[in-house]
Regions:
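N-terminal export leaders
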Residues: 3-9
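Gram-negative bacterial Sec-dependent N-terminal signal peptides
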Residues: 11-13
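N-terminal signal peptide c-region/cleavage motif recognized by signal peptidases
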Residues: 15-17
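Repeat-mediated protein-protein interaction surfaces in helical alpha-solenoids
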Residues: 20-22
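Short solvent-exposed beta->alpha transition segments
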Residues: 24-25, 31-35, 39-42, 49-96
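A short, structure-level motif marking secondary-structure boundaries and short turns
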Residues: 24-26, 101-102
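Intrinsically disordered, low-complexity polar segments enriched in Ser/Thr/Pro and acidic
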Residues: 29-30, 141
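Exposed beta-sheet edge and beta->alpha loop/turn motif
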Residues: 91-141
């Protein structure tokens, strides 16, 4: 893992314990963000392509074009997101104006990973604008 990525991950994991307050966001925003991520993961578990696609931001929807292409990409590229064994929500943070929800996922291979979900407000709803996976510092279970 490149040194910069390690340093960024270490800073994120050690900065503030629990769910950090992000300027301009309420506790209900945090709950809504976690709800969107959780409902999208449940849609993936059911292979509900249209349902999962609905939680993606307009930019992601435009990039993939169809729910089926989106689901296929997640299935191939993000197996821990597509079929997690466990999901644990971490810190909600703000990075250069971006809202990022940290989620600890354990995939079917039992290897923990940290998913960094970039969130975007669309009207009065939250949508997922991107997801980056990094290795967790935890040992697989």
């Amino acid at each position: 893992m490149p040194m910069l990525r390690r340093l960024l991950l270490a800073a994120m994991l050690t900065s503030a314990a629990g769910r950090a307050r992000v300027e301009g966001l309420s506790a209900s925003d945090g709950a809504a963000i976690r709800g969107v991520i959780g409902r999208q993961i449940e849609a993936f578990r059911r292979d509900d392509a249209p349902g999962a696609f609905d939680f993606a931001s307009p930019g992601i929807q435009k990039m993939f074009g169809t729910p089926e292409r989106f689901l296929d990409m997640v299935r191939r590229t993000y197996p821990a997101v597509y079929r997690p064994r466990s999901v644990e929500y971490g810190e909600l943070s703000q990075d250069n104006g971006r809202i990022v929800q940290q989620v600890e996922l354990t995939g079917q291979d039992r290897q923990p990973q940290v998913a960094l979900y970039e969130m975007e407000r669309v009207g009065d709803a939250w949508r997922i604008a991107g997801c980056t996976l990094v290795r967790s510092l935890r040992v697989g279970t």
